[in-house]
Amino acid sequence: MKGTTIRSRLNPKLEVSVIAGHFATRHSHNNHYIDITRMKHEHTMAREAAVTLAQRYAYEKGVDTIVCLDGSEVLGAFLARHLAKNTLFAVNSDKNINVITPEYDSNGQLLFRDNLIPMVASRNVLLLISTVCLLYTS
């Protein structure tokens, strides 16, 4: 499918494809699909996305753990690297940031094994989600 390419205003190296059509999931019906596959899985695109995302958190928000959902582990690893960079006034400078992925139980609920619970319990957690569904009524 051919889509329209949209570039980020914050980082012109970041781009996504938007495809018009009818896309149905178990929970929603959408008129457009935003393809962020390249952003999640390509080295250079994931790095650029992480640099851009890190700008929002580097100087204001402490992050102990990044929880990666929807296949966003590559992006999460780059994000942790950029958040922990040793820069002036960075909140997470030289910090060891955990990057984890939960499991799912048979009902589709998130499950953190015993060895991961200390990384999320009473911690500053950043959820990295690559699935968004916008619902509204007119």
Language model features by range: what are they?
Residues 1-138:
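PRPP-associated nucleotide enzymes
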